[in-house]
Amino acid sequence: MKLAFICTEKLPAPAIKGGAIQMMIDGVSPFLSEKHDLTIFSISDKMLHSRETINRTHYIRFPRENYRNSVAEELKNHSFDVIHVFNRPKNIELYKQASPSSRIVLSLHNDMFLERKISDELGKKAINLTTKITTVSEYIKNRLIARFPEAEKKITVMYSGVDLKMYPPIWTKQGSMIRQKYREKYGIGDKKVILFVGRLSKTKGPHILIHTLKKLVKENNDIVLVITGGKWFSDNRLNDYVRYLYKLAEPLKEHIIFTKFIPPDEIPNIFLMADVFVCSSQWNEPLARVNYEAMAAGIPLITTNRGGNGEVVMDQQTGIIINDYNNPSAYVKAIQYLIDNPSYANWMAKNGRSFIETNFDFKHVAERLEKVYIDAYEESVIKNL
């Protein structure tokens, strides 16, 4: 099949500046391009050529300004069997007009059918023009069908994944060496490390973890909170919230390290520094990919029961799920339990790694996506007979 991926106007592909969508595309494209002719559309970046082919995958990039129209014009020059539109239902009609014979697959990585984001008319039209819809979680699926019940028959839940080759677990020789190297880099030594990875925004909850640390250090002087991320992908500029975090952390500066933005290819190494990873999402997260990453690295995981986060974590088996998500004391209890019970923490971490190996390597994701594309293609062929 001739496949096209149309990224959003937010970030370039490959994921040189991060982004969950871009990282998933990077993960599945090597597998899909082995069997199919794959073209990826994304915004341009000064570090990338406007057109190039890398490992059988074709990339076409346009400036952010007028991006969607540039893509639509380019589609007219091709004959794609399936066009996969990422997270932009509003653009479906434009792309379908540009390539009317193509089957459209829409993937939803956020709650893009909110009333403030799309009208009833545009929402219905987008659903009617798509052959298949994928969602990153049951949570996002349920949010969509609550407003547009007619979409249900088209939806497949498509969980993301990781490149396991990038995540040597902490108990392997390679993982142990990386752990030691990065602990030396940040001057951590043998201290217990609580890790946060994500955008520095109130919705992600790093402030909750600083309040948690205040309580933890009363009983654990050898504990460090490592906060990895910037205010936006690859953006380390300060805003009011980041300034607030720094001020909040000032009394605990000996126990907190801000690494700022870390390139995506280095993130697996950051995970290996940790003794406990905490996904402190305060909003109804579609499903944070850091949950997959922590389990892949073999790090004991604590996550909040917000949005889709709990869907890929088995409570008390592959991670600990916190319901009282905005209460620092709930995090203290979970973190302290894992610190005090290393055998249990290790058992849980190994369960998590095994769970990822069995279900969420990017090869698994690519196979599930390919089935959606084939079903979309065959469904349209049958309709035309």
Predicted regions and their residues:
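Conserved donor-binding/catalytic core segment of Leloir-type glycosyltransferases
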Residues: A4-I6, T134, M177-R179, R183, ...
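N-terminal strand-loop element at the rim of the active site
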Residues: E9-A15, M23-E65
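Acidic donor-binding loop of glycosyltransferase active sites
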Residues: L272-P286, I299
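Short hydrophobic beta-strand element within catalytic cores of glycosyltransferases
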Residues: P300-T303, V313
